[in-house]
Structure formats: structure tokens, C-alpha cells
Amino acid sequence: MQLNSSMSAVITGGASGLGAATARLLASKGVKVALFDLNVEQGEALAQELKGVFCKVDVTSQEDCESGFAKARETIGQERILVNCAGTGNAVKTAGRDKQTGAIKTFPMDKFELIVQINLLGTFRCIALSAAGMMTLDPCDEFGERGVIVNTASVAAQDGQMGQASYSAPKAGV
């Protein structure tokens, strides 16, 4: 796909890290960008810098995702590009001993479930909503392409380390 100024992109986790770098790269090619993130201060500042739009989106919320895509499309048009960078991790052993009592304790399932909600299910939520929107577009090339979706996984999905099971599992799913 040739990037140009007629295209729009949504970047989840777009306020910092890989998401911000991706947004900067796309904007440098003329692509209009919408940044989805929870960090309002950084997101709004970067959106202003890139002449894009910031949408406060919690990817664990279907309602937030739907509202974010609606706002982005209203402001910069239907995206042809989705880059899923939203993610989090928690470097904690799955099981260990309490240093004071010696009792065995396990990683809290609610923390694991939140990481899965963000890293795996949040990615899928945005894929589904973006793909549905892209289906409304005319093809942009002779091959019938309507858009592109890029999902960021991690080498940890294949080569995890101690304390990364809660991060590695959903990244393997991506």
C-alpha cells in the first residue's frame, strides 16, 4: 500500500512508545492520524503536533472503542490503516514465596485477566471495528485492497522469560 495524504490511520496506544513512533512515521508520509490512548495529556500533545486527532479510548471497553472510531472517522475520515500498539505487562512471577512468611502465593487472576483484556481482546475489538469500516471503502489498488491492519505482538510470545507469563500468553494470541 502506498501511503499518501488521502489516507487516515488509527493507532492504538498512540500516545507513547511504539504507537507514538508509528504515528509520527505515518504523519511524516502525509497520512492523517487518530491516536487512541488513555493518556490524555500526551495524546492531545502528540495529536496537536501531528495535526491529528486524539481519542481517549480504553481498549477493554467496546463502548470506548466504538466511540473512538466514530470520532476518528468524523474528524479524519474512514481509516485505511489500523496499527494496534496498545498493550501492557506485569513482570511478576506466576507463583512465589512471601519473603516474610514463606507462604506460597500466586499471581492474582484479576491482574492476568486485565492484561489479556488489553493485549489480546482489545486488539481484536479494534480489528473487528476497523475491518467493518474498511469494508465500506472502494479498493485503493488493482488488487482490491481496502486497507491494512498491523498488530504488534512480541518475541516474548515465543521466548518468554520468568515473570512474563501474563504478558507472553496474550501476545502469543495476537
Where are these regions (language model features)?
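Conserved glycine-rich Rossmann-like NAD(P)H-binding loop of the short-chain dehydrogenase/reductase
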Residues: 29-45
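Substrate-binding pocket helix/loop in short-chain dehydrogenase/reductase
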Residues: 93-104, 108-113
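Active-site loop immediately N-terminal to the catalytic Tyr-X3-Lys motif
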Residues: 159-168
